[in-house]
């Protein structure tokens, strides 16, 4: 199986399955000399780990990270950093009824047709369990980005099923299990999820991520465009079916006079581009939004086929997230951090000594308008 690595100069390669002994990753390309500890990585993992509320899977995984290499006396050495998270709460018996059948909407059928073999326990490699190691790698990237450039990356849920969540305050994001930036709407989200869980069905979500403090100049103009790599990384997250940068699909209804971000000596007047023009960062906030589909594993009867091609009716037992989007915010933040660190190193390697006489604009003029405020520093 290829396609398990992301990045060029900062490269993350993950391994492991949902019900295997462990999951992990190798982070290659981190510069030497940066202090890093398991405690710092654990903070991010704890934001994502399962079993933290009644609205997510009740699989109890502590997600305790081990640093196996690449760090000596608490400092990165410049060699590959190996991270390991041991699986401790697998319950493979829950998946016995799908060993010979395929769950509608899941990767089961596609994996079977491609490889001729699949690990049906918890979805194997296709499980969102693997995203824990992406969060661990992202913790390294976001610390380096913040130390070197002051970059701050934060995300939030902007929609749960049919319920849109207006942005109010960054401080609210960490105070509820939905990563919702609006305290007043949390009771409605809880009621909705309680009813959904009772029904046995699932639902999708929309996650927004903002990177503030990204310097102008990161990214490449053609195939390795910054926005293209961001979209590639986000689409690599389990269950993600759509990604927007800036105004995204709403730009279809805009006119050029509205969409183009005017510039003044005081800064940009808007940020419809989402901080990227021509594949290169503008110095404005990077604005990313992604759509997460409903969980495919549900306990309601669904029509499918078995390995012989015969019609069957299946339902899925086990401990599943009724909305995988609830825990997706830390994952999206991590993926954005990994892409940005990779491009930061690439820019430094090629254009580190480039200077330009034109002043760098403020990311937003005092009179400028942006849908989502920048994260607090």
Curated annotation (Swiss-Prot):
Organism: Aromatoleum aromaticum (strain DSM 19018 / LMG 30748 / EbN1) (Azoarcus sp. (strain EbN1))
Binding site for FMN: 125-127, 238-239, 278, 293-297, 319
Role this protein plays: This reaction introduces a second double bond into the aromatic ring system.
Biological pathway: Metabolic intermediate biosynthesis; chorismate biosynthesis; chorismate from D-erythrose 4-phosphate and phosphoenolpyruvate: step 7/7
Pfam family, one: Chorismate_synt
SUPFAM superfamilies, sorted: Chorismate synthase, AroC
Key words of the record: Amino-acid biosynthesis, Aromatic amino acid biosynthesis, FAD, Flavoprotein, FMN, Lyase, NADP
Family: Belongs to the chorismate synthase family.
Gene: aroC
Complex formation: Homotetramer.
Name listed for the protein in its UniProt record: Chorismate synthase
PANTHER family according to UniProt: CHORISMATE SYNTHASE
GO cellular component: cytosol
Top-level taxon of the source organism: Bacteria
Cofactor: FMNH2
Gene3D superfamilies reported in the protein's UniProt record: Chorismate synthase AroC
GO molecular-function term, one example from the UniProt record: chorismate synthase activity
């Amino acid at each position: 199986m290829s396609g398990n690595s992301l990045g060029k100069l900062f490269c993350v390669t993950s391994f492991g399955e949902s019900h295997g002994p462990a999951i992990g990753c190798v982070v290659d390309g981190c510069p030497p000399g940066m202090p890093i500890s398991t405690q710092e990585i654990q903070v991010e993992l704890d934001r994502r780990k399962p079993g933290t509320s009644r609205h997510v899977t009740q699989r109890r995984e502590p997600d305790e990270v081990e640093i196996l290499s690449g760090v000596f006396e608490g400092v990165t050495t410049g060699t590959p950093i190996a991270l390991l998270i041991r699986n401790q709460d697998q319950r493979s018996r829950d998946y016995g009824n799908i060993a010979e059948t395929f769950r509608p909407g899941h990767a089961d059928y596609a994996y079977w047709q491609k490889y001729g073999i699949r690990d049906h326990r918890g979805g194997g490699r296709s499980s969102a369990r693997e995203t824990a190691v992406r969060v661990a790698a992202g913790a390294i990237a976001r610390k380096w980005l913040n130390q070197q450039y002051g970059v701050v990356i934060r995300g939030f849920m902007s929609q749960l099923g049919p319920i849109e969540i207006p942005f109010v305050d960054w401080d609210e994001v960490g105070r509820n299990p939905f990563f919702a930036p609006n305290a007043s709407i949390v009771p409605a989200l809880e009621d909705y999820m309680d009813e959904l869980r009772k029904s046995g069905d699932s639902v999708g979500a929309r996650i927004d991520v903002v990177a503030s403090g990204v310097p102008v100049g990161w990214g490449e103009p053609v195939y390795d465009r910054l926005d293209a790599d961001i979209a590639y990384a986000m689409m690599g997250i389990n269950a993600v079916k759509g990604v927007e940068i800036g105004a995204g699909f709403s730009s279809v209804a805009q006119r050029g006079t509205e969409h183009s971000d005017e510039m003044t000596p005081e800064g940009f007047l808007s940020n419809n581009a989402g901080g990227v023009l021509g594949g290169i960062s503008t110095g404005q906030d990077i604005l990313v939004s992604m759509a997460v589909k409903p969980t495919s594993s549900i306990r309601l009867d669904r029509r499918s086929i078995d390995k012989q091609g015969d019609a069957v009716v299946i339902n899925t037992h086990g401990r599943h997230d009724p909305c995988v989007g609830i825990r997706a915010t830390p994952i999206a933040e991590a993926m954005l951090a990994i892409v940005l660190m990779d491009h930061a190193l690439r820019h430094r390697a090629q254009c580190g000594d480039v200077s330009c006489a034109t002043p760098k604009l403020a990311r937003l003029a005092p009179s400028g308008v942006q849908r989502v405020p920048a994260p607090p520093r």
